[in-house]
Design a protein with these regions (language model features):
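Short, structured "edge-of-domain" segments at secondary-structure transitions
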Residues: 1-220
Length: 220
């Protein structure tokens, strides 16, 4: 399993090494790794080939768990090395990277994204679609083709995906053009956004206004 943190680090740990417990909250993840002050886990990913393929394999209509897992494993084996992830910081910079880069790390982890100043990683996502939707906290949204996002094989900042002025990235979602996203505002109310309602543009733009008065706090 891979843990992605706000400091641009990734920690890859074998599941059978995790402490086992029948009850309680388990052991704090900070005890497993050498986190810096203020570093938090912002996302995690199972690296089980069948789990990775789950979101990308068409349904066969077979309700057998064994059959489904075999289908997923076959899919993952056929696409070995081809699956990618995406990571984006609050500054609007981000990149794609091959999941084959995620190998077991030490307790100190490995630098995945280079951050400047007080910038923090907003999120990580497995790439399961061809369009990327991003929203800034001041109410602007943009949709760009995933293939415009730089592919890096090592640590870096990536490219500017959205131009932010006096704001920061609230979140992002990857899907196909007919996909949608749910925005959460500072008053805890939500709003559904359809990708097809936003014109696809090139990376680096400011986007369009999708919320005039409310601050966006999360994107799902």
């Amino acid at each position: 399993v891979a843990f992605f943190t706000s400091r641009g680090m990734v920690y890859v740990f074998k599941l059978y090494n995790l402490p086992y417990t029948r009850a309680g909250f388990g052991e704090p993840v900070q005890n497993l790794f050498k986190f810096a002050d203020g570093e938090k886990v912002i996302s995690m990913l199972s690296l089980d080939p069948a789990e990775l393929a789950a979101g990308q394999t068409p349904s066969s209509g077979d309700s057998s768990n064994k059959s489904t897992r075999q289908t997923r494993l076959s899919f993952a084996d056929d696409n070995k090395g081809g699956l990618e992830g995406m990571i984006i910081g609050g500054s609007g910079y981000g990149f794609r990277f091959p999941l084959s880069n995620l190998i077991e790390t030490t307790r100190s982890g490995r630098k995945l994204m280079t951050l400047k100043g007080d910038d923090k990683v907003v999120g990580f996502s497995l790439i399961t679609g061809d369009h990327l939707f991003m929203a800034s906290d001041n109410g602007k949204g943009i949709v760009i083709p995933v293939d415009q996002v730089s592919l890096l094989t090592g640590a870096g900042m990536g490219s500017r995906l959205i131009k932010l002025i006096n704001s920061s990235l609230a979140g992002f979602k990857i899907a196909n053009k007919n996909g949608h996203s749910t925005l959460t505002f500072d008053d805890r109310k939500t709003k559904k956004i359809n990708f097809k309602d936003i014109r696809v543009t090139n990376r680096g733009g400011q986007g369009i206004i999708i919320s005039k008065r409310k601050k966006i706090t999360a994107v799902e």
